[in-house]
Design a protein with these regions (language model features):
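Short coil-to-beta-strand transition motifs
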Residues: 117-125
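Acidic-enriched and Gly/Ser
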Residues: 1-115, 127-133, 138-166
């Protein structure tokens, strides 16, 4: 079986997913938790990783192909030269692994104070800015009376223990 991408109607990803699953089609609709500030309050919301798209796993000879486009919420099958674009299994697995990594990284948020464990900045406090891929982070450190942005391995930072001030 092979993975393919489907485009769904705006704001109807969950509807398309439910109808596809009702037809016993194997689906993958990757979502991540995002933190947003709305009306001055931080809220966490689950959002699609690829807005407007979900993935299905089918054989090319599967009779379900003809039903895909008429499934509620589905717009079209992503195709090139009128042929559905196959997505390699390893790409889907990488997306799944990345979702797991993103969930694990959820412990450190932008603006949070962190401490560096290794390298030339060992023992220095910093402010976490962002993730830079799966294995690096961007932090802001005070260095020679200046704020400096530095990229460091994610494994070298941890949330700063409370009770300590700089």
């Amino acid at each position: 079986m092979t993975w393919y991408a489907l485009q769904h109607k705006p704001a109807q990803g969950n509807r398309a997913l439910a109808h596809l699953q009702n037809q016993e089609i194997i689906c993958f609709y990757p979502k991540i938790t995002v933190e947003k500030i709305k009306a001055g309050k931080r809220t966490k919301k689950l959002e699609p990783l690829f807005p407007g798209y979900l993935f299905v796993n089918l054989e090319q000879t599967d009779p379900m192909w003809s039903k895909l486009r008429s499934t509620r919420g589905v717009v079209r099958i992503v195709s090139f030269a009128n042929k559905p674009a196959a997505i390699p299994d390893d790409v889907i697995q990488h997306i799944k692994d990345s979702l797991h990594t993103v969930a694990e990284q959820g412990g450190i948020k932008p603006g949070q104070h962190v401490e560096l464990d290794e390298g030339p900045f060992k023992g220095i406090s910093a402010i976490f800015q962002a993730y830079d891929g799966e294995e690096r982070a961007i932090v802001l450190i005070s260095f020679m009376q200046k704020q400096q942005t530095v990229k460091v391995p994610l494994s070298t930072i941890h949330p700063r223990r409370s009770g300590r001030s700089d």
